[in-house]
Amino acid sequence: MSSGTPYIGSKISLISKAQIRYEGILYTIDTENSTVALAKVRSFGTEDRPTDRPAPPREEVYEYIIFRGSDIKDITVCEPPKASHALPQDPAIVQSSLGSAPAASYQPSVPYSPFRGMPTYSQLAATSLLSQQYAASLGLEKLGSPTASAGASSSCSSPSPQPVAPEPDVPAEPPQLSQNAGYPSIPVRKSPMVEQAVQTGPLENQAQKKVQQAKGAPVGQRGVRQSGPQSQPAPLNVPPPAAPVLGTINDENRRPPRRRSGNRRTRNRSRGQNRPTTVKENPIKFEGDFDFETANAQFNREELDKEFKDKLNFKEEKPEKEGEEKTDSGVETQNSDGNPEEDPLGPNTYYDRSKSFFDNISSEMKSRRTTWAEERKLNTETFGVSGRFLRGRSFRGGFRGGRGSAAPRRNQTTQRAGTGRV
């Protein structure tokens, strides 16, 4: 990487369009996404530059910040890259580790050595983006102990038992970078302006601190292990504990799901009445057009009339005698003993013009007729008791909406009419 771009590993001073100056080590320049990535970045604020939103300097050192190229105002190279003392490019090397070094002796060439198996900067940023939403969208991560990156509100809101300082095991980062070589190459989405990221940093830190308190794990148990030369402080692997913060924040910002029930009542419907469900019936499929000629050929009106007459057994009509009294055979009549009279037409005669004007086709026979009591009982069993019987006397809501019976009210009207006080 250093051979292709000579400024990789140099100390860069960058000024954004918000007049905020940043200093860090140039890590990568992405020409496709038009982004510039700096490592070990520190913000110096606006520094009396004219701006609508002045920002003070910050003491935090971020692991990396990805800047959008369109929001960069000026870039200056402060120091050239230092000589590289890293291992040569040997494909046989899978993992390496260096002993602890003093914090002052910073070797920028070690974490930026051109390993073949090391993923690009966009891949490392993408893995952190997937596990931490705020740090992903803002493109930044604090440098320091893992406790400072997991619950990073120590420098903003409350004092922390562990001081925020650069890691003495900075050269131990290449093993962690080589372990991340198996991540797929996921494109990094463009982050918003960095000045917004700096302002929303404490909010992320407070959310992460709440997650630690909920789990009940003390901060001291998550310290960096520096007991031997094999110590590997994984600053890039710390963001996974912040994954529960995503669900908490997303659940708070998400609308509650709407409850859908098929038995939802409406205001205009009566109590206990459910909404009718519409069932889609399958449409009838016709194979072809209707053939009228074939249907007319099958329809013979003369044969149907003959068959109808045979079933009804019509008799020849006789001339009606003048002055003959006509009796209604369809009306049930009873004698004084209560027995029904005999049918003048006979049991098998449906219509005889000489005997009666009425027929026995559409009317019920006397043997099948019911009395008014039986008919009333049948109506009650079929339709239930009528509601008009509830408005009797001594009930509220009688005739004309008055209390009690309706008879006194009629008497009052009659008396008023007699006295002329209508």
Swiss-Prot record:
Q: Where is the composition biased (Pro residues)?
A: 160-174
Q: Which residues form the DFDF domain?
A: 278-314
Q: Which UniProt keywords apply?
A: Developmental protein, Ribonucleoprotein, Translation regulation
Which residue ranges does the record annotate as region Disordered? 145-290, 309-354, 394-422
The motif FFD box: which residues? 349-365
Q: What does this protein do?
A: May be involved in the storage of translationally inactive mRNAs and protect them from degradation. Plays a role in control of mRNA translation.
**Protein family according to the UniProt entry:** Belongs to the LSM14 family.
Q: What's the name of the protein?
A: Protein LSM14 homolog B-A
Tell me which species this is from.
Answer: Xenopus laevis
Tell me the organism's taxonomic lineage: Eukaryota, Metazoa, Chordata, Craniata, Vertebrata
